[in-house]
Regions:
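Short acidic/glycine-rich loops and adjacent helix/strand connectors
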Residues: 1-130
Length: 130
C-alpha cells in the first residue's frame, strides 16, 4: 500500500512530503521510500505562519484564511511528491504554529493549522489527521 506523509514544523520553511510503499503484516511492516520532496512556502505564507507562532493576533476569518492557505500548500507538496496519485491515503497533522514542551507544571501540547476535509477534497483521497 502506498501512502503519502506530509510534515511541516515550527521552522515554517515549507512542507516535506514522502511517498512510501508499505508491505507485510501490521506487526512487522516493511517499507520502501519511493520519493521525497521539500516544497518551500512562498515568502508571504512563511511570514504569516511565523507571525502567528510569535503571537500575532487576528480575527477568526484571518485564522481560517491562514489554515486554508496552509492546506493549499500541503496539497501542492503532495502533488509534487505523488504526481500520479499512487498513494491510497495521506497522513498530515498540518502546520505546527506553536509547540509547548512538557514541564513539571504543564503538559506538552502542539497546535497545528489544517483544513483536513479540504485537503482530502483537493487530493481526492482520504486524509488521516489529528
Amino acid at each position: 500500500m502506498r501512502c503519502l506523509g506530509l510534515m511541516s514544523g515550527t521552522s515554517a520553511d515549507g512542507v516535506d512530503a514522502v511517498l512510501a510503499d508499505f508491505r507485510g503484516s501490521p506487526n512487522h511492516p516493511q517499507w520502501e521510500l519511493i520519493r521525497h520532496v521539500h516544497s518551500p512556502y512562498p515568502e508571504g505564507l512563511r511570514h504569516r505562519v511565523v507571525s502567528a507562532g510569535q503571537g500575532e493576533t487576528g480575527c477568526a476569518e484571518q485564522w481560517l484564511d491562514l489554515a486554508e492557505a496552509i492546506t493549499e500548500a500541503q496539497a501542492k507538496a503532495a502533488r509534487s511528491c505523488d504526481p500520479h496519485g499512487e498513494a491510497v491515503l495521506v497522513g498530515c497533522h498540518g502546520q505546527t504554529v506553536w509547540h509547548r514542551p512538557p514541564t513539571s507544571q504543564q503538559r506538552g501540547a502542539s497546535w497545528q493549522l489544517l483544513q483536513a476535509p479540504l485537503l482530502a477534497q483537493l487530493l481526492e483521497r482520504p486524509v488521516v489527521h489529528d
